[in-house]
């Protein structure tokens, strides 16, 4: 099939490469978000998907208003049979959705109807789900509600960050998307409506929402930190210093101190503990402002934290 591929971040690259290399499909163009400021100088840089497409001599479409009449006409002139979407990053209007005769097929990183929205992987980890997956479905105007073509499942490991899990889903999801498009091209695949029950939402997580709330139970905090790693990144105030947090540990490998009030900090020779709404959590790595991630105990000793300083 003649395909237009819509995607923006690195997460979309496995699917893009799979479709470019497929002998059954022809990626005639890539649709991605406009170049965005990057680095300290704020120089506009193309998205990972744009860079990958340009390296393969595939035309790149970067409309600032993808639902404008002008862009709908531009896409229509390309005459795609189907459009494949992986993390494009913009809502698609009715006119745009009506361009390809086989519609728009989205790869979403959850087992729909669970975790509709921008942050499904983060939501699954934070909720303590044991299993998640990826779903291909026909895009409709309403959010992630279209009929489903196929799914693939993935176990959530106890130490998975959102980055870890998304990396695996991007690869398995690429296979699923390719198989889905093969089935559509053959006329052998029919989408089925999503169940009405089991709908949950996963809106984008803000930087403020990634701030650790130490009054919560330790297991919830541990999951939430993994859920926002690497982006937007967990953080806390230690005194008046804003510190990013790497992994935290709730295990039997190291004996924790006695009970600590939420936010209270205890430092020994090898470890840093912070009190929660239940048992203390052990910090693995921290990133003070302007520095790289470092061992939490090394940082705490060097910073000579006052015993009265708390995390908040």
From Swiss-Prot:
- Tell me the GO molecular function terms: methionyl-tRNA formyltransferase activity
Query: Could you tell me which InterPro entries the record lists for this protein?
Result: Fmt (IPR005794), Formyl_trans_C (IPR005793), Formyl_transf_N (IPR002376), Formyl_transf_N_sf (IPR036477), Formyl_transferase-like_C_sf (IPR011034), Met-tRNA-FMT_C (IPR044135), Met-tRNA-FMT_N (IPR041711)
The keyword Transferase appears for this protein: yes
Q: What is the superkingdom listed in this entry's lineage?
A: Bacteria
Q: Which EC number(s) are documented for this chain?
A: 2.1.2.9
One of the record's GO cellular component terms: cytosol
> Which residues are noted in the entry as (6S)-5,6,7,8-tetrahydrofolate-binding?
110-113
Swiss-Prot/TrEMBL catalytic activity: L-methionyl-tRNA(fMet) + (6R)-10-formyltetrahydrofolate = N-formyl-L-methionyl-tRNA(fMet) + (6S)-5,6,7,8-tetrahydrofolate + H(+)
Instruction: Tell me the keywords, alphabetical order.
Output: Protein biosynthesis, Transferase
**Would you identify the family this protein belongs to, as annotated?**
Belongs to the Fmt family.
> NCBIfam families, per this entry?
fmt (TIGR00460)
- What is this protein's function? Attaches a formyl group to the free amino group of methionyl-tRNA(fMet). The formyl group appears to play a dual role in the initiator identity of N-formylmethionyl-tRNA by promoting its recognition by IF2 and preventing the misappropriation of this tRNA by the elongation apparatus.
* Protein name per UniProt: Methionyl-tRNA formyltransferase
Record the organism. Mycobacterium marinum (strain ATCC BAA-535 / M)
Q: Gene behind this chain?
A: fmt
